Amino acid sequence: MGKLYTALGLMSGTSMDGVDASIIKSDGERVYSALFDRYFEYGDKIRQKILAIRQKILVPDHLVKHESEIKDIEREITFFHSNVVKEILNNNKIDVDLLGFHGQTIFHDSKKKITKQLGDGKLLSQLTKKKVVYNFRQNDLKNGGQGAPLTPIFHNLIANKYLKEELDKFYSVNILNIGGISNITQTVKWDELDKKKNYIKACDIAPGNCLIDEWVRKKSKKKYDIGGVLAGIGKTDELILNQALENFNIGPPYEDSLDIKDFDISFAKGLSLEDGTSTL
């Protein structure tokens, strides 16, 4: 077992609706325990700013074109995260060693090795007086990765932790993670006659909830389909769905990470709010 760290992780996904905060204790490999979890919703103003700037950044050059606006929003988001950290630490008697700061993704292109998350790690460290680990996706790209998905490291830890005793010699675990984008992790351990083989394979495979979120925002005053109510009421249009699946052209070998801008909802434009939500 390696050194145990108590870390406060801050994650804001492609739904762009707020920050998930978790305090965990882990050695990063096998030992893991959750100490605190809470969701902090963005205010309407900051959320609209994030949505607006993301829609403006269509190609890498737009990051330069809108640099001033990006910096302003980035500072605002960093202060939001700082307030989250202070509220958590002030209300919970837990001493954390470091903060994990993902930031808010507004652009991701794995082929061009460019990704942008809103969030200033150095400023967050100054505001909270804590060590901050950040630039996860940028560093993954620099080291030959796709910048996404990042969850496989945690999936592998879960497999090692919970399956070691039951399947000591061999296991193959597949974990499907459905966020804005869906990704899958396969973690394998094989140990037979001292022939050891351990590996992790992971990739993005398809859109997850990002299309539903966009559809609901455009067709109603809701931010997303709360509890799947709209989809439950609606009827899936199989013809439109099958045509969309053919046009998406997603399949093996799943070499490139995906971004929500790789997909659009135009194919469902003739459907009602409920039927479109069900189909998407």
Positions of predicted regions on the chain:
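Gly/Thr-rich phosphate-binding beta-strand-loop-beta motif of the actin/hexokinase/Hsp70
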Residues: G2-L35, Y171-W190
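Short glycine-rich, Thr/Ser-proximal phosphate-binding strand/loop in the N-terminal lobe
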Residues: M11, S15-S68, K197-A202
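A glycine- and small-aliphatic-rich helix-loop capping segment at beta-alpha/alpha-beta transitions
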Residues: I23-R30, K112-L123, I158-N160, V188-Y199, ...
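Short glycine/proline- and acidic residue-enriched helix-loop micro-motifs
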Residues: V59-I73, K223-L230, L273-E274
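Short beta-strand-loop/turn "lid" adjacent to the catalytic site in phosphate-handling enzymes
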Residues: D61-G121
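Glycine-rich phosphate-binding loop and adjoining helix at the ATP-binding site
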Residues: D95-N156
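Glycine-rich phosphate-binding loop of actin/hexokinase-like ATP-binding domains
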Residues: N160-A231
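A contiguous, well-structured pocket-lining segment that forms one wall/lid of small-molecule binding clefts
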Residues: K221-L280
